[in-house]
Amino acid sequence: MGQKINPIGLRVGIIRDWEAKWYAEKDFASLLHEDLKIRKFIDNELKEASVSHVEIERAANRINIAIHTGKPGMVIGKGGSEIEKLRNKLNALTDKKVHINVIEIKKVDLDARLVAENIARQLENRASFRRVQKQAITRAMKLGAKGIKTQVSGRLGGADIARAEQYSEGTVPLHTLRADIDYAHAEADTTYGKLGVKVWIYRGEVLPTKNTSGGGK
């Protein structure tokens, strides 16, 4: 059912492409674990750089990494110093030659992961869960989103009984496979425990294109 499954996984190969673009028969497990290690390392190193997602391509003994970020200047650093440090660390981590490409996200309020992390960060700073959700919805709709839904769950406002509250505006057609829906979840560590944040953003319809190499955009 469209409302239960992860909207991104449901659309991979139809209107969304894979974030890992490689194939291996014998070494699949070890390369998959290496991918997970790379993603975790980048998330830890670039915590404050608004990283949305990371794409990994492999060719022989070389790894091409595309980092989609809302703050490219922070990733690159002055004169490329920060990206050079990151490349050297990834070279040592993987024992392979790593090439990094930084891609700027121009509209950060239309990226579900960045919106979810922003809400979580504000909740950690004791902001009102109602206000931060409504503000996120207003900003996304102003930038041209067709619809957005947010949900915060846990001990809201320090209540003894955990609950979930969600707000939405516009339409979010989860069953429509050609609907470009971005989804993400984040966690906020508060004094009362963890709060879960979920965000769905509908950015319009995308017509699927035929791809003989195995789907995707």
UniProtKB/Swiss-Prot annotation:
GO CC annotation, single: cytosolic small ribosomal subunit
Superkingdom of source: Bacteria
GO molecular function terms noted in the UniProt entry: mRNA binding; rRNA binding; structural constituent of ribosome
Domain KH type-2: 38-106
Biological-process GO terms, alphabetical: translation
UniProtKB keywords: Ribonucleoprotein, Ribosomal protein, RNA-binding, rRNA-binding
One Pfam family recorded for the sequence: Ribosomal_S3_C
InterPro entries: KH_dom, KH_dom-like_a/b, KH_dom_type_2, KH_sf_prok-type, Ribosomal_S3_C_sf, Ribosomal_uS3_bac-typ, Ribosomal_uS3_C, Ribosomal_uS3_CS
Family label: Belongs to the universal ribosomal protein uS3 family.
Function statement: Binds the lower part of the 30S subunit head. Binds mRNA in the 70S ribosome, positioning it for translation.
Complex and partners: Part of the 30S ribosomal subunit. Forms a tight complex with proteins S10 and S14.
Name the UniProt record assigns to this protein: Small ribosomal subunit protein uS3
Annotated organism of origin: Staphylococcus aureus (strain NCTC 8325 / PS 47)
Gene: rpsC
